[in-house]
């Protein structure tokens, strides 16, 4: 049996978009991935709409590790991730190792801030201009995969984003097995 795949979801000190964090993490667990939430410490993070999420680990404890995917949620707090050198190191190590990076909503601006390349992206409409001015080609799709980077528009596309990650890491059969229990079957 293959080793369980791993995902690291990055949490800013505050103001993450909780739908993107919670839905993505939950779907990935249902898809068979081991999910860790990392914050600046292990103190609870107050999200943009008031939910509190307790990180499993502090960033300093995972900065030299690699994961199958590292995920950057959006929300106003992702600007703190863009300013954090440890996040930059973590993402660059992830790219060098050939791992995936996922970014949703305003999360792609963290890629821009740390020089992570993806030819095409999608993102929240409020940061579209910033991304195109930064040299990324914007696509008006709910989810875009380009150069081992998976991006998505925002809270309303969180299920589609998470399912695309599961499909990429575990295959379409696994993704299809999740649709009916999640009431997403067509």
From Swiss-Prot:
A single GO BP: lactate biosynthetic process
Alphabetized UniProt keyword annotations: Cytoplasm, Lyase
Expression sites by tissue: Expressed in various tissues, including pharyngeal muscles, pharynx-intestinal valve, ventral nerve cord, spermatheca, rectal gland, inner labial (IL) cells of head neurons, phasmid (PHA/PHB) neurons in tail and supporting sheath/socket cells, as well as in head mesodermal cells (HMC), excretory canals and coelomocytes.
UniProt-listed InterPro entries: Class_I_gatase-like, DJ-1, DJ-1/PfpI, Prot/Nucl_acid_deglycase
The organism's place on the tree of life at top rank: Eukaryota
Localisation per UniProt entry: Cytoplasm
Enzyme Commission code: 4.2.1.130
Catalytic reactions of this protein: methylglyoxal + H2O = (R)-lactate + H(+)
Pfam families: DJ-1_PfpI
Main location: cytoplasm
GO CC annotation, single: cytoplasm
One example GO MF annotation: glyoxalase III activity
UniProt keyword annotation of Repeat present: no
Regulation: induction: Induced by DAF-16 during starvation as well as in the dauer stage.
Transmembrane segments: none
Coiled-coil boundaries: none
Active site: 20, 105, 124
Similarity section: Belongs to the peptidase C56 family. DJ-1 subfamily.
Protein name as annotated: Glutathione-independent glyoxalase DJR-1.2
Organism: Caenorhabditis elegans
Gene that encodes the chain: djr-1.2
């Amino acid at each position: 049996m293959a080793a369980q795949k791993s995902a690291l979801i990055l949490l800013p000190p505050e103001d993450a978009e909780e739908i993107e964090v919670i839905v993505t993490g939950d779907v990935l667990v249902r898809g068979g991935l081991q999910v860790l939430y990392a914050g600046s410490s292990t103190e609870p993070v107050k999200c943009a709409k008031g939910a509190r999420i307790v990180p499993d680990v502090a960033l300093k404890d995972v900065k030299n590790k690699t994961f199958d995917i590292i995920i950057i949620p959006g929300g106003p707090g992702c600007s703190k991730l863009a300013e954090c050198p440890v996040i930059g190191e973590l993402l660059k190590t992830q790219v060098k190792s050939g791992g995936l990076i996922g970014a949703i909503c305003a999360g792609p601006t963290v890629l821009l801030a740390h020089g992570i390349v993806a030819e095409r992206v999608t993102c929240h409409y409020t940061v579209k201009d910033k991304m195109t001015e930064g040299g990324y080609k914007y696509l008006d799709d709910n989810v875009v995969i380009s150069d081992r980077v998976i991006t998505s528009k925002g809270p309303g596309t969180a299920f589609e984003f998470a399912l695309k990650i599961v499909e990429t890491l575990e295959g379409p059969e696994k993704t299809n097995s999740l649709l009916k229990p999640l009431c997403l079957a067509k």
